[in-house]
């Protein structure tokens, strides 16, 4: 099996590939969002006619966050997530080519210099 072509979709608008609406962020900040499982984690989706996976994680004390897995040989320098512009502490990104069944973790560089690898509750797309 050949190496998959995986790329990040970027846009001029910081939340153009986000599953979060302004209402979601309001509910999240007030502690009243009861369906965060629909937003955080990994979600198969199509963006700009490309199939892939949208990832989102709450990491308010992070300096950098990336997604690692077999698809990038567990390399934390690839598949970097972007912090939301609204300072919610949510990091997110869409990557084409990451499909169903992929195992993943979040690689988190904290603002205190720690490096952590955190498994998501699902940990499989």
Report each predicted region and the residues it spans.
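N-terminal accessory interaction module
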Residues: 1-3
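Aromatic-rich carbohydrate-binding modules that target alpha-glucans
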Residues: 24, 36-48, 54-101, 107-123
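A general sequence property marking short-to-moderate contiguous segments
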Residues: 6-41
């Amino acid at each position: 099996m050949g190496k998959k072509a995986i790329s990040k979709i970027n846009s001029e608008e910081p939340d153009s590939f986000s599953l979060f609406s302004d209402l979601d962020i309001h509910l999240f900040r007030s502690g009243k969002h009861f369906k965060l499982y629909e937003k955080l984690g990994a979600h198969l989706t199509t963006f700009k006619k490309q199939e892939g996976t949208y990832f989102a994680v709450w990491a308010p004390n992070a300096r950098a966050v990336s997604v690692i897995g077999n698809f990038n040989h567990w390399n934390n320098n690839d598949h970097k997530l972007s912090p939301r512009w609204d300072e919610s502490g949510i990091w997110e990104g869409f990557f084409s080519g990451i499909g169903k069944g992929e195992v993943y973790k979040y690689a988190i560089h904290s603002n205190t210099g720690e490096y952590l690898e955190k498994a998501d509750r699902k940990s499989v797309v």
